[in-house]
Regions:
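Generic signal for short, ordered secondary-structure residues
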Residues: 9-10, 49-50, 90, 107-111
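Glycine-rich, N-terminal phosphate-binding loop of Rossmann-like dinucleotide-binding domains
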Residues: 14, 80-81, 124
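Phosphate/pyrophosphate-binding active-site segments
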Residues: 1, 98-170
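Glycine-rich, anion-gripping cofactor-binding loops and their flanking helix/strand elements
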Residues: 18-102
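Cofactor-pocket helix-loop regions in the catalytic cores of large enzyme subunits
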Residues: 1-53, 143-170
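Alpha-helix C-terminal capping/helix-to-coil transition sites in glycosyltransferase folds
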Residues: 6, 72-73, 116
């Protein structure tokens, strides 16, 4: 909890462990308490509301520019039920290089496997979040969130169709 309380630019990174653990409600409360942006992996889809303003899209090679820039600038990455796959981290030496990394996970094989973390809390993600939420007071990271929201405006995930796509032409 100390890492979380001292962070000025926290970022929450959600993976499949949060889905398997059915931790959506606890995750929602955690995000509100920490007042931080949220990114996820393909396996983490559904654990957090992908339509909310705090949500920045997926992370990594299949992710958004906002998520990738934000994680590169954060001072604390809170990894919840993630594997740190190569499609997410890219160059391990450059991944979240300005951040402490705090991992919540049930699988000891995932800890320090691809990314060395600063601290890990082992156990069921839902239970971890319940306990952490009980110990946190609401925080405010207004400037950090405004910075991330500016990225979302500057680099929106949009689609602009121009003419017929390949399948329609056939």
């Amino acid at each position: 909890v100390s890492y979380i309380r001292h962070a000025k630019k926290p970022y929450i990174f959600v993976g499949g462990g949060a889905v398997i653990s059915e931790a959506s409600e606890e995750l929602k409360e955690f995000v509100e308490l920490v007042d931080a942006p949220v990114t996820d992996t393909l396996m983490g889809k559904g654990a957090y509301d992908g339509t909310g303003e705090r949500y920045t899209g997926m992370l990594g090679m299949h992710g958004t520019k906002t998520s990738n820039l934000g994680v590169s600038e954060c001072d604390l990455l809170i990894a919840i039920g993630v594997r740190f796959s190569d499609r997410v981290i890219g160059n391990a030496k450059k991944f979240a290089r300005h951040a402490k990394i705090l991992q919540f996970d049930v699988d000891p094989a995932e800890v320090n496997k691809n990314i060395v973390v600063d601290a890990c809390v082992m156990g069921d993600v839902r239970e971890i979040l319940k306990k952490v939420n009980e110990r946190l007071e609401p925080m405010e990271h207004r400037e950090w969130m405004e910075h991330i929201l500016e990225y979302k405006k500057q680099y929106p995930l949009t689609y602009h169709p121009q003419g017929l796509s390949g399948p329609y032409m056939i």
